[in-house]
Amino acid sequence: MSTEPSRTALAARLRALHVPGDPLVLPNVWDCASARAVADAGFPAVATGSAAVAPALGYEDGEGTPADEMLAAVARIARAVPVPVTADMERGYGMGPAELAERLAATGAVGCNLEDTDHRTGAPADAGEQAEYLAGLRAADPDLVINARTDSFVRGAGGPAERLADAADRMRAYLEAGADCVYPIGALDETAVRAVVEAVDGRPVNVLSWPGGPSPARLAELGVARISFGHQLHQLLQEYFTGLVAAVARGDSPFPKD
C-alpha cells in the first residue's frame, strides 16, 4: 500500500499555504537541481518559473517553449521533490482548459500559474475570455490550485490609476471564476501592493519580490499571501556562472582563494 500523499492531499496542502499575512514564499525553480535545493532548504512547496525554465531548455519566454517540453520539465521536477509543485503554464500554450488540466495532472503538479497576456499579440487578453478559461479549468480539475496572473500593470493601457482599476476588475473576475489566488505582476511598491490587497477584500494575492521593493517580511505585513521571484534567482546564478567562465577565459582560477 502506497504511503505517498494523494494528488488531492497535495493540492489541499498547497492551497492551505496561501494565508494573507503569513505568505507562502516560492523561490522559483527551473530544473530538478534547483527544485531539490528549494525543498531541501525547508520550503513547503516548489514553483516553476517559465522565464527561467525556457532559457534552461533553450527557448525564449512568452510561450516560446513547446508545450510538450515544458510539461516534461514540470514532470521531472514534480518527481524530484516530495512537496507540492505548482507550474507556470504562461497562458496555456494553446491548450483548452480541459486538455491543460489533464496534461498538468499527468505531470504530478497540483497547481498552476496562468497569465492573461495574449502572446500572439503581446496585448492583454479579453478579461471575460480569460475568466471563462479559468472557469473551465476549475470545472475540469476541482483540486488544481490556480494562481491567476494579470499583466495589467505591465501591459495595460493608461496611467497608474487606470492600470490599477483594470487589475482590480480582472482580479475580482478571476477569483469569481474559480482562481484560488491572484497575481498582479508589476505591483512592486508598497502603495501598489496595499491597493491590490485591498481590492480583493482579503482574498489571497501573490506579489513578485523585486530588487528595491518591499522585503518578504514587509509584504507579509501588507497582507500578501504568496511571494514569488520569477526568473531572478536563475538570472543571478547565470550571472555568477558567467563571471566564473570569464575568470577561466582570462587564465585565472574560478575557485575562491583560501
Where on the chain are the PLM-derived regions?
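Structured C-terminal subdomain patch of bacterial secreted/periplasmic proteins
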Residues: 235-255
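Alpha/beta enzyme core
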Residues: 3-87, 91-207, 213-231, 236-242
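Flexible, glycine/charged-enriched surface loops at secondary-structure junctions
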Residues: 185, 254-257
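Non-transmembrane, interaction-prone segments in cytosolic or luminal domains
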Residues: 71, 88, 247, 256-257
